[in-house]
Amino acid sequence: MATRSPSVVISDDEPGYDLDLFCIPNHYAEDLEKVFIPHGLIMDRTERLARDVMKEMGGHHIVALCVLKGGYKFFADLLDYIKALNRNSDRSIPMTVDFIRLKSYCNDQSTGDIKVIGGDDLSTLTGKNVLIVEDIIDTGKTMQTLLSLVKQHNPKMVKVASLLVKRTPRSVGYRPDFVGFEIPDKFVVGYALDYNEYFRDLNHVCVISETGKAKYKA
């Protein structure tokens, strides 16, 4: 049985932090309930994940595959930490990047209908160590679909890093190899996670309010 990937577990009754304790853009002041994961904590956890990735995958050229759009902030910060490790290590490895865009959400619900609406030719992944970087695993269906697409091209290794994994009864049971935080079944935004394209410009991961859902509903 595979070992469960470690993560920072945020409990169901976690109260979060008052918005007025942090710098929040004024245009979102009424649209959020609370700050759930402050930006500094995200960065510290991401730094450790970079070390874990290098320890497990650092023996061979890595292709880092970013799942757009929500994964781009985590992707950029994770790669910055990996590059820093590369610069300061006797054993550095080459790394290239690629991008794919998937869509499975309308409003705050994962539709289960996975659309690949961007990305380069995945045949370039053949024989490579592939690190897929995602913002959040909700039901897990999106990632299972992407993994099946990637594995058709016979990569040497495929690992998945996700900033967040949601505890939800809708989960198919999939868990990535590298996990930042395990969170309750709440719809979170910020740090590039969106609600119908809004809130990507927040630094912190926050819980959206009912007012925010109504205002930005598709």
UniProtKB/Swiss-Prot annotation:
InterPro entries: HGPRT, Hxn_phspho_trans, PRibTrfase_dom, PRTase-like. It is an enzyme of class 2 (transferase). The modification Phosphothreonine is found at residue 142. One of its GO terms (biological process) is purine nucleotide biosynthetic process. GO terms for molecular function: guanine phosphoribosyltransferase activity; hypoxanthine phosphoribosyltransferase activity; identical protein binding; magnesium ion binding; nucleotide binding. Binds 2 magnesium ions per subunit. The magnesium ions are essentially bound to the substrate and have few direct interactions with the protein. Transmembrane segments: none annotated. It catalyses: IMP + diphosphate = hypoxanthine + 5-phospho-alpha-D-ribose 1-diphosphate; GMP + diphosphate = guanine + 5-phospho-alpha-D-ribose 1-diphosphate. Mg(2+) binds at residue 194. This is Hypoxanthine-guanine phosphoribosyltransferase. It comes from Sus scrofa (Pig).
